[in-house]
Structure formats: C-alpha cells, structure tokens
C-alpha cells in the first residue's frame, strides 16, 4: 500500500469517526430537549428534507459561552463544579465540542 493510499484510508477513518461523533452528539441533544422549543414544545430538529428551524446565532452563542467558561476555569485554575475531579477547562472545552457537533448535526 502506498503512502497516498494509507493517508486516504486514515482520512476516511477520521471522517467516519467525525460523522459518528456528530450523530451521537446530535441524537443526545435531541433526547435531552435541546431541540425543542421550550415555550411551544415544537420540535426544532429537522429531517433531511426539511429546512432547519433553528436560531443558528443562538447556537453559536452557546458554543461561545462554553469557551468563555473554559477561559474562566483556566484563568482561575478551577475544578469543575459538576465533575469535581476534572479541571473546569477540560469540561467546558468538551461541552463546546459537543455543541459544535450538535449544531453540525442539526444543520446537516
């Protein structure tokens, strides 16, 4: 196998893992109610044929808030309040990644 073939196979594996993470984060978010309008109970997630009914700027601000919380944890050298054995920086960065994959899953 050539280096180019090996690199391509590695890319396909990484792409597949990214797809799996995106779907897992999106499915978990739907199950957790992140894709339901709190006021109306309307389902906000879409099927492939539908136009997304989400507020993308709101979702981006939620990602930004996780990054801001990570910065605060780093600046103050804090442990996480819900996972006290982990640094707040680690947990908030993981939350930001989850929200990124969730948004990507939601907009297709």
Q: Model-derived features: where do they sit?
A:
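Flexible "arm" and connector segments at domain edges
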Residues: 1-108
